[in-house]
Amino acid sequence: MVMQTMLRVLTVSLAFALTSYALPAAADEFEVTIHHVELQDPGLKAKVGDAISFVNHADISHNLYLTYEDGQVETLDTQPPRTTKRTVLKRAGHVVVRCWIHPIIRMEFDVAAK
């Protein structure tokens, strides 16, 4: 009798734990295409943890970097033609994407908290 009661309590506890456990939201993947000296802005609705891939379809190299609202800079290093660079968004707030080589290239978007 005691064993059955303990088993019921354990079963109910386990069921409650499994149903109340929330899985983290899956991260989204975005792709931004570089055409010569222009970034195709796909209208990002990004959040912290999402990934962005920058695909260089230009015939020239680029060197993109992201500047977060708090001043933190993340550089993606030199990106030769027909290559892809990927980054995961680390902070919420306003982000500006620019190219060290071609300062005319610019894209802005906001990153929401998780």
Swiss-Prot record:
Pathway assignment: One-carbon metabolism; methylamine degradation
Function summary: Probably involved in TTQ prosthetic group biosynthesis.
Protein name: Methylamine utilization protein MauL
Organism field: Methylorubrum extorquens (strain ATCC 14718 / DSM 1338 / JCM 2805 / NCIMB 9133 / AM1)
